[in-house]
């Protein structure tokens, strides 16, 4: 299924206006994006009567990069989440368009409330706090947190990190950050996952907490695997969901839910999973 991509800088001015109206100026580290005023102001009906912010497009808010869930490769946005949402777009008879925006604006529900996108797929964990502002699809991914540290650090748990008085880093606005705080840490926060990894590589922190698939993807890179290692997997019982505007369009919600459910039943989900993670569901760790 084809898709198009709206980079952050292309529509930065419009995003700043929306952010100002919503009081979101302090939300995140990167520039946010939005549809043009004419697109955001009115919805258009797609197959089955779905109301979409842009004619012929299922517009997805995400935060790049978050490999292997969503990242740019050869000028295109690809990834596990992209393939999942493509299934829903196909059901609606449209193509997917991707908008790169700060994760804090996504998880607050403000991006969809402002008409920036129809759905959000950004490796986003379903939480009760987020449910207050976002409607979620059925779960599409079982998530686990992980700790990445310099080789020889000698830690295998958050307890070890605390006992050794090591500096912990986490990505801002994430459940990894929340989990660390619940365990008594005050982590150094980084705006996105690449900055978090750079913080570890540059010695700003000694250990970082991040979703396991992201850590495993980093470790495929020789420059990371040479000096750093996965020291712990933390079973936090998290599940990702596709986010929708509160009081979501029932046609869009049904398309997303049906796409996920049917893909799991007919083997498509497993094919996508193996494509991006190299293992079948339940084998990742």
Regions picked out by a protein language model, each given a short descriptive name:
Residues 40, 45-122:
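Extracytoplasmic small-molecule ligand-binding "clamshell" domains
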């Amino acid at each position: 299924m084809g898709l198009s991509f709206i980079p952050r800088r292309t529509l930065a001015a419009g995003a700043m206006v929306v952010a100002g109206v919503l009081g979101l100026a302090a939300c995140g580290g990167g520039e946010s994006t939005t549809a043009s005023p004419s697109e955001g102001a009115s919805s258009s009906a797609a197959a089955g009567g779905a109301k979409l912010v842009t004619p012929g497009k299922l517009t997805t808010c995400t935060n790049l990069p978050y490999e292997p869930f969503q990242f740019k490769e050869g000028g295109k946005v690809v990834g596990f989440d992209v393939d999942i949402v493509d299934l829903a777009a196909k059901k609606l008879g449209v193509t997917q368009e991707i908008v790169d925006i700060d994760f804090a604006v996504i998880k607050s529900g403000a991006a969809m409330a402002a008409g920036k996108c129809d759905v959000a797929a950004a490796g986003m964990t379903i939480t009760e706090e987020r449910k207050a502002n976002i409607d979620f699809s059925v779960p599409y991914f079982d998530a686990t947190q992980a700790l990445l540290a310099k080789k020889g650090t000698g830690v295998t748990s958050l307890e070890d990190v605390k006992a050794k008085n090591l500096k912990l880093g986490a990505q801002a606005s994430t459940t990894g950050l929340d989990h660390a705080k619940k365990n008594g840490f005050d982590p150094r926060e980084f705006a996105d996952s690449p900055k978090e990894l750079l913080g570890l590589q540059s010695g700003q922190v000694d250990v970082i907490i991040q979703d396991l698939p992201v850590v495993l993807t980093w470790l495929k890179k020789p420059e990371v695997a040479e000096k750093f290692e996965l020291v712990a997997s933390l079973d936090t019982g998290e599940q990702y969901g596709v986010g929708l505007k509160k009081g979501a369009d029932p046609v869009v919600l049904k398309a997303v839910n049906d796409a996920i459910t049917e893909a799991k039943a007919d083997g498509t989900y497993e094919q996508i999973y193996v494509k991006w993670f190299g293992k079948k569901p339940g084998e990742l760790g």
